[in-house]
Amino acid sequence: MTSLERTDAERLVEMLVVGFGGLAAGVIASVLLGVVLGPLGVPLDDLAVGLVLSVVGLAIGFVATAIAYLRYRNLPLSSLRLERPTLLDLGWVVAGTLVLLGIALALGVLVELLPVSEPSEHQVFEIAEDRPEILLLMIPMSLLFVGPGEEVLFRGVIQTRLVEFYGDAVGIVVTSVVFAVAHLPAYAGEGVGISIAILFSLSIVIGWLYERTDNLVVPALVHGIYNAVLFATVYVTLTTDLF
C-alpha cells in the first residue's frame, strides 16, 4: 500500500470519527440537559420533554463537534460556506424540498410494489401514534434544530472535507452513507435497511444542492422543511379523515 493510499484511508477514518463522534456528543449533551433541567422541576419522564431534550442535545452535539473539528484543523468558519440566501438560493430550497418529497413518495410506492419489507418507522412516528400532538412540536424543532444541526456537521464539515479530498461525486456519496448510517439508532424492525436506503437517496440530493449552491443555508432549510412537511402530513393523517 502506498503512502498516498494510507493518507486517503486516514482521511476517510477521520471523517467517520467526526460523524459518529458528533452523534455521541449529541447523546451526551441530551443527558447533560436532563441533568441540569431535572432539579429545576422539568418533567423528564414526559415523552414530549424527552423528545425536545434529545433533539436540542443532538443539535448542540453536532454543532459543537463541527466547531471543535474546525479549530483542531485550524479551518475558518467560512469553510462551512454559510451565506445569506439569495432569491436564487430560496428557489433552490423550494425545488429541493419538492424533489425530496417526490423521491420519498416514489420510493414508498416502489417498496409497496416489490416483495420487500416495509420501511421501519422513525421512533418519533411510533410515539406519535399515541400522542400525535408531538408531531406539531417537531415541526418548529425540525426547522430550528434538526435541519441546521445535522447539516452543519454532515454537509458543512464532513462533505466539504471529503469533496476536497476525493471530488464532488465521491464526497457526496460517502457523506450520504455516513449520514444514513448515523440515523440507525432512530429506526428498528425488519425494514430498517429500506429506511436507511431511502435516507441515503435523499441525502444524495441534499449533498448535491450544497455543492450546487455553495451555501449551507440551502441544505439546512431543505432538510428542515422536508421533515416539517412529513410531520405535518402524518399529524393530519392521524387526527383527521382527509387521508
Q: Model features per residue range: what roles?
A:
Residues 112-132:
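Membrane-interface interhelical connector segments
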Residues 5-13, 17, 44, 48-52, ...:
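Structural motif marking the loop-to-transmembrane transition
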Residues 1-98, 105-113, 228-243:
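N-terminal, membrane-interfacial amphipathic/helix-forming hydrophobic leader that caps
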Residues 102, 130-243:
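Transmembrane helix-loop-helix hairpins at the membrane interface
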Residues 84-91, 118-123, 185, 198, ...:
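Extracytoplasmic/periplasmic mature domains of Sec-exported, cell-envelope-associated bacterial proteins
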